[in-house]
């Protein structure tokens, strides 16, 4: 006969695992230190109301850029340049970051951050415009890393374009892939959640891609292309 204590024990184990997972993520998020230039860019991001990746997400972007030997990178969502600085720190010294943002003011501020970091003008290509239009003008299989930090509603379209841009051996990274956990909540049906799930489906069903969901920031969906 099953013990009546089993459901309570199972619930307790689940709660303990959830707390442990939260503690691990919290430790990861606070284990990365940023230099003064990135910290200043982060402060400017707050001033202009532009989102910025967490230090742990930035460090992961740096690692992915190093692992892919990234020479050509596309970023959707320049913001104040925080993620761009992290990407550049992991790219090859002759690498070029193409970063797209619809807000010219964001790009002006990001350009300041890049200059403060000693990044030469030839290493960045800042394009002001709608990513929906800009991405379609970029060449197929010409980029080592694509980073998408955009509104959830735009993720499916940007994933399609981003995968098209990837060279074999490259990687695509989608920020805000968890929406604070809502993306994994079966009861959540709103348009943002639906769009994020569609982006994840597109990646999961592409046989050329090997994906992983990483619980940093607001969730990162990363995938390597064969």
UniProtKB/Swiss-Prot annotation:
Ligand binding (S-adenosyl-L-methionine): 53, 75, 77-78, 83, 101-102
GO biological process: methylation
One GO MF term: S-adenosylmethionine-dependent methyltransferase activity
Binding annotation for substrate: 149
EC number(s) reported in the record: 2.1.1.-
Keyword Methyltransferase attached: yes
Pfam families: Methyltransf_3
Annotated protein name in UniProt: Putative O-methyltransferase Mflv_2199
UniProt xrefs under PANTHER family: O-METHYLTRANSFERASE RV1220C-RELATED, O-METHYLTRANSFERASE-RELATED
InterPro entries cross-referenced by the UniProt entry: Cation-dep_OMT, SAM-dependent_MTases_sf, SAM_O-MeTrfase
Keywords: Methyltransferase, S-adenosyl-L-methionine, Transferase
SUPFAM superfamilies (UniProt xref): S-adenosyl-L-methionine-dependent methyltransferases
Enzyme class: transferase
CDD domains per record: AdoMet_MTases
Family: Belongs to the class I-like SAM-binding methyltransferase superfamily. Cation-dependent O-methyltransferase family.
């Amino acid at each position: 006969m099953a013990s009546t204590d089993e459901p309570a024990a199972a619930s307790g184990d689940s709660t303990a695992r959830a707390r442990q997972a939260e503690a691990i993520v919290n430790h990861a998020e606070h284990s990365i230190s940023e230099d003064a230039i990135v910290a200043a860019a982060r402060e400017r991001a707050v001033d202009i109301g532009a989102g910025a990746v967490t230090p742990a997400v930035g460090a992961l972007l740096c690692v992915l850029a190093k692992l892919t030997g990234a020479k050509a990178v596309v970023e959707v969502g320049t913001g104040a340049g925080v993620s761009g600085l992290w990407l550049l720190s992991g790219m090859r010294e002759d690498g070029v970051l193409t970063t797209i943002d619809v807000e010219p003011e964001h790009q002006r501020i990001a350009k300041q951050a890049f200059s403060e970091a000693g990044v030469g003008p030839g290493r960045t290509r800042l394009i002001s415009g709608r990513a929906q239009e800009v991405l379609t003008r970029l060449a197929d299989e010409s980029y080592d890393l694509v980073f998408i930090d955009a509104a959830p509603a735009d993720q499916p379209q940007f994933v399609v374009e981003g995968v098209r841009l990837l060279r074999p051996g490259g990687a695509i990274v989608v920020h805000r892939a968890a929406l604070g956990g809502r993306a994994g909540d079966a009861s959540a049906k709103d348009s943002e959640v639906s769009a994020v799930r569609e982006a994840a489906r597109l990646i999961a069903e592409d046989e050329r891609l090997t994906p992983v969901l990483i619980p940093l920031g607001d969730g990162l969906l990363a995938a390597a292309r064969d």
